[in-house]
């Protein structure tokens, strides 16, 4: 899969339960539209969406399950349970929260990865990280690639976005690890996506700027309310 998406665009087709497009059918059609637009892969949330998308398109899928736990801030494929559920849907790669935040049940990231490798040694794993340190740890633990997915979404990185300072975090991660680095998070224009690849990102994931009409509409309405002088 990593070779298939190299130097190309992956589209994140996700809609949570509180969003208007929440539907496996709709996400599968969104994936079809992304494929027609030239996407090289899809990032999908939930078993139902992953299965529906794989029936609709031939593109490789990065699967994940977002599941909240009252005792932890980690919610992207947080435990072995979610991995087991996803394996049945057969995504080409599974994404996990690889931040250093406390995990559900007190399990460590190292323990989770060891458990995954013991059962599915050939499974491709993507580490969703928020810092350079987390990227380095993910590489040491044997992840196949890292994504900048959670930069700006942890307590330590709140208020930051990936594009700031000409993608400083992306540059730092690229310099720190040898495994593929996937740029993801607030990559909301074609120019920013191209910049990520020019800097050396293995691939770039774009989500809301393509697949969340409410966010796209908000950008227009905000601009109309505050026109440039």
Question: What are the residue ranges of the model-derived segments?
Answer:
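P-loop/Walker A phosphate-binding loop and immediately adjacent motor/lid segment at beta-alpha junctions
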Residues: 110-111, 117-122, 179, 225-228
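A short, structure-level motif marking secondary-structure boundaries and short turns
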Residues: 9, 14-17, 35-36, 67-68, ...
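Conserved N-terminal beta1-alpha1 strand-loop-helix module at the mouth
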Residues: 1-88, 125, 133-145, 225
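Glycine-enriched alpha-helix->loop->beta-strand junction motifs that scaffold or abut catalytic
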Residues: 38, 57-61, 89-93, 119-122, ...
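Conserved hydrophobic beta-strand within the GNAT/NAT acetyltransferase core sheet
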Residues: 44, 125-127, 181-185
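Active-site-adjacent beta->alpha loops and helix N-cap segments on the catalytic face
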Residues: 20-24, 43-62, 73-81, 98-116, ...
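C-terminal alpha-helical cap/extension of soluble enzyme domains
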Residues: 1-2, 7-28, 163-229
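Glycine-rich phosphate-binding active-site loops on the catalytic face of alpha/beta enzymes
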Residues: 14-16, 65-70, 89-103, 145-158, ...
């Amino acid at each position: 899969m990593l070779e298939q998406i190299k130097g190309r665009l992956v589209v994140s087709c996700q809609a949570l339960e509180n969003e208007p497009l929440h539907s496996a059918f709709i996400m599968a059609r969104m994936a079809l539209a992304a494929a027609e637009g030239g996407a090289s892969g899809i990032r999908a949330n939930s078993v139902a969406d992953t299965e529906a998308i794989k029936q609709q398109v031939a593109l490789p899928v990065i699967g994940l399950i977002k599941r909240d736990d009252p005792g932890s801030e980690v919610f992207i494929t947080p435990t072995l349970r979610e991995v087991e559920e996803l394996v049945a849907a057969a995504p080409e790669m599974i994404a996990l929260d690889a931040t250093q935040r406390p995990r559900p049940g007190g399990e460590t990231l190292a323990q989770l990865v060891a458990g995954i490798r013991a059962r599915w040694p050939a499974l491709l794993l993507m580490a969703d990280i928020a810092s350079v340190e987390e990227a380095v740890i993910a590489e040491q633990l044997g992840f196949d690639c890292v994504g900048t997915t959670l930069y700006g979404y942890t307590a330590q990185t709140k208020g930051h976005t990936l594009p700031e300072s000409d993608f400083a975090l992306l540059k730092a991660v690229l310099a720190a690890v040898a495994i593929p680095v996937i740029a993801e998070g607030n990559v909301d224009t074609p120019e920013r996506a191209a910049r990520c690849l020019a800097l050396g990102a293995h691939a770039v994931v774009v989500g809301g700027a393509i697949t969340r009409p409410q966010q796209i509409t908000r950008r227009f309405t905000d601009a109309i309310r505050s026109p440039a002088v």
